[in-house]
């Protein structure tokens, strides 16, 4: 375990070769004497693990949730409704022109080591994230970021982006520029209401938080401490909430809901974006034909999957976005169970005798869906062999060769970064590894058409923007290079008699920014 007994920024002036060196240095200097907030210890049991602790390009469910508490962006998203609010920013961006904005930092903003947050830190954080493979697509609208002075940051954009600006700026979390990217992965330090005191994100590990005594922003810590246990096993998490050794449990297994409620906990389901999807190798026949791809979605009895495997806690797909999202539009092609339609499409595509396919299934919760999917596909003339394993994503990068798979079943949920349609579509359909490798869809005219529509929507607003997004949703429902089977409801359990102000969110992660111990 990496013990992060955090001290002054001077500790990080030189890069340490190992976590052990840093831990020893920290131990020698002693802990910062953080001022404590009133009110005991918030406890939680998390469902995901990670050993990458850096906020740069952070995409793990565990550490993204942790960064919401330890770091700040210029603006932050309220994950309960995806509204934005100023965090490190003193207020709204100052519009210089359609493609230039200035942001002033909050007076007195400090990191948990007591040092000031300055504009150079913001510039450094944005530049590192703009160069990051994960976040670069989210930030492609930015041409340059510069420090006007210690308190003011200037953003020059490549094109107008006003309607989405604040939510997208919230993706980047700010940290001291004097700390190297490598050291941020060992001893991360931020300006948020909480600071790490110990950090071990392995399965079976834990994260301890203490209040940042220097925090002067809108969401101060409301407890003396916070402790997260990491338990990927659903039974272990269930035991913790039932024994009341944890106030909050992430990712409740449907089979355990009754027992958890019987032990006195509240279980709350939230409609969200989380989804299992089919992804096709579109450079490989017959999956280069959209009629074949469409046949899969008619062949699968999704409602039966929802009823039998998901215990009813999912919603059929009517579009790329779920109906609960503000920008929902019912797509031109809504798939319902129709095996005869599937057979007809295969016949139209020249495969009247059916096709043989290997379905590569990720070995996580979607594996429970695979047997019924296999049976449904077989019945529609799509003769399916299952291969269930941990996906080796390194094999699925951009290549001149045909990638080594036919069709994949795996889950995803980029709504932890935001809920605007451009961000969500950019994740899977943008100019990145999902389309240059993986689905290999970026060689098609339809992909180019989608990029043009998305770019027009970025520069638009209001009804015009929504209409352009609607065209995108329609196109995706027709082409289905990668498309959801259903949108999943996420279940969180909590002890309402022990924690106040906690509200579950509809994506991975836990938020305690307004929660306190009763």
Question: Which stretches of residues belong to each language-model region?
Answer:
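Alpha-helical secondary-structure segments
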Residues: 43, 118-125, 150-156, 193, ...
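Gly/Pro-rich hinge or "lid" segments in bacterial periplasmic/extracellular proteins
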Residues: 78-83, 168-221, 225-227, 235, ...
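Surface-exposed binding/hinge segments that line
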Residues: 94, 104, 137-178
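Long beta-strand-rich cores associated with HINT superfamily self-processing modules
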Residues: 492-518
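Structural transition elements
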Residues: 315-348, 363-368
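Extracytoplasmic/peripheral linker and loop segments enriched in polar/acidic and small residues
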Residues: 383-395, 423-496
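N-terminal lobe/hinge region of extracytoplasmic solute-binding protein
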Residues: 45-96, 127, 189
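Ligand-site clamp/hinge motif
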Residues: 214-259, 383
């Amino acid at each position: 375990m990496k013990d992060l007994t955090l001290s002054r920024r001077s500790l990080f002036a030189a890069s340490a070769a190992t976590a052990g060196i840093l831990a020893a240095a920290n131990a020698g200097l002693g802990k910062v004497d953080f001022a404590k907030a009133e009110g005991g210890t918030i406890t939680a049991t998390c469902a995901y693990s990670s050993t990458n602790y850096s906020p740069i390009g952070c995409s793990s469910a565990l550490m993204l949730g942790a960064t919401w508490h330890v770091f700040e962006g210029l603006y932050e998203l309220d994950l309960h409704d995806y509204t934005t609010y100023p965090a490190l920013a003193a207020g709204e961006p100052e519009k210089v022109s359609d493609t230039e904005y200035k942001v002033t930092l909050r007076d007195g903003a400090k990191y948990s080591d007591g040092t000031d947050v300055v504009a150079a830190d913001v510039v450094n954080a944005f530049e590192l994230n703009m160069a990051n493979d994960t976040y670069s697509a989210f930030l492609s609208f930015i041409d340059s970021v510069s420090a006007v002075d210690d308190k003011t940051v200037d953003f020059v954009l490549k094109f107008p982006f006003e309607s989405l600006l604040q939510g997208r700026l919230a993706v980047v979390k700010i940290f001291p520029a004097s700390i190297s990217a490598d050291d941020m992965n060992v001893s991360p330090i931020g300006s948020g209401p909480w600071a790490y005191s110990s950090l071990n994100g392995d399965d079976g590990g834990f994260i301890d938080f203490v209040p940042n005594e220097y925090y002067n922003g809108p969401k101060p810590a409301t407890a003396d401490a916070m402790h997260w246990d990491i338990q990927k096993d659903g039974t272990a998490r269930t035991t913790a909430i039932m024994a009341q050794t944890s106030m909050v449990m992430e990712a409740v297994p449907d089979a355990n809901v009754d027992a958890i409620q019987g032990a006195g906990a509240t279980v709350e389901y939230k409609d969200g974006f989380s989804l299992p999807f089919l992804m096709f190798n579109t450079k490989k026949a017959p999956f280069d034909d959209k009629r074949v791809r469409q046949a899969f979605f008619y062949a699968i009895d999704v409602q039966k999957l929802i009823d039998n495997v998901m215990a009813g806690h999912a919603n059929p797909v009517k579009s790329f976005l779920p109906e609960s999202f503000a920008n929902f539009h019912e797509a031109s092609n809504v798939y319902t169970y129709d095996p005869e339609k599937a057979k007809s499409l295969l016949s139209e595509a020249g495969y009247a005798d059916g096709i043989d396919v290997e379905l590569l299934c990720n070995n996580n919760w979607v594996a429970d869906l695979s047997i019924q999917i296999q049976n449904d596909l077989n019945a529609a003339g799509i003769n399916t062999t299952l291969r269930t394993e941990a996906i080796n994503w390194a094999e699925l990068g951009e290549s001149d060769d045909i990638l080594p798979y036919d069709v994949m079943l795996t889950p995803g949920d980029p709504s932890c970064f935001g809920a605007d349609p451009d961000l969500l579509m950019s994740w899977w359909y943008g100019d990145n590894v999902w389309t240059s490798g993986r689905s290999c869809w970026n060689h098609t005219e339809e992909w180019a058409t989608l990029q043009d529509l998305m770019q027009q929507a970025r520069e638009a607003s209001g009804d015009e923007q929504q209409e352009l997004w609607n065209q995108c949703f329609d196109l995706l429902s027709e082409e289905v290079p990668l498309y959801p089977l259903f949108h999943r409801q996420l279940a969180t359990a909590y002890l309402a008699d022990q924690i106040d102000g906690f509200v579950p969110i509809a994506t991975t992660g836990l938020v305690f920014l307004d929660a306190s111990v009763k």
